[in-house]
């Protein structure tokens, strides 16, 4: 629970540019995970859900900011 709160506070403290950079990094990581899975090299499949949830959290924060006008 504390991890989630610290993650939320970390996201709210970042600028929009930093959020977009982090989002792009996570998208690249997700692509690499899919590539590794196709090749049969992926050991930790739970990383998929963690990366996808992080992407969703960042997108939610960006949407929240765009609707509030920041």
Swiss-Prot record:
Listed A to Z, the keywords are:
Ribonucleoprotein, Ribosomal protein
Q: Name one GO biological process term.
A: translation
An MF annotation (GO) of this entry: structural constituent of ribosome
Q: Which InterPro entries match?
A: Ribosomal_protein_uL29 (IPR050063), Ribosomal_uL29 (IPR001854), Ribosomal_uL29_CS (IPR018254), Ribosomal_uL29_sf (IPR036049)
Q: Name one GO cellular component term.
A: cytosolic large ribosomal subunit
Q: Which residues form a coiled coil?
A: none
Looking up PROSITE patterns in the UniProt record yields: RIBOSOMAL_L29
Give the stretches traversing the membrane.
none
The record, for SUPFAM superfamilies, names:
Ribosomal protein L29 (L29p)
Pfam families, A to Z: Ribosomal_L29
The UniProt entry, under NCBIfam families, shows:
L29
Regarding protein family, the annotation reads: Belongs to the universal ribosomal protein uL29 family.
Please report the name of this protein according to its UniProt entry: Large ribosomal subunit protein uL29
Which source organism does the UniProt entry give?
A: Rickettsia bellii (strain OSU 85-389)
Gene from which this protein is expressed: rpmC
């Amino acid at each position: 629970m504390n991890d989630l709160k610290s993650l939320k506070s970390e996201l709210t403290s970042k600028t929009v540019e930093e959020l977009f950079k982090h989002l792009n990094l996570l998208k690249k990581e997700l692509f690499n995970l899919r590539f590794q899975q196709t090749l049969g090299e992926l050991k930790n499949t739970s990383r998929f859900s963690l990366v996808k949830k992080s992407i969703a959290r960042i997108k939610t924060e960006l949407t929240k900011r765009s609707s509030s006008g920041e």
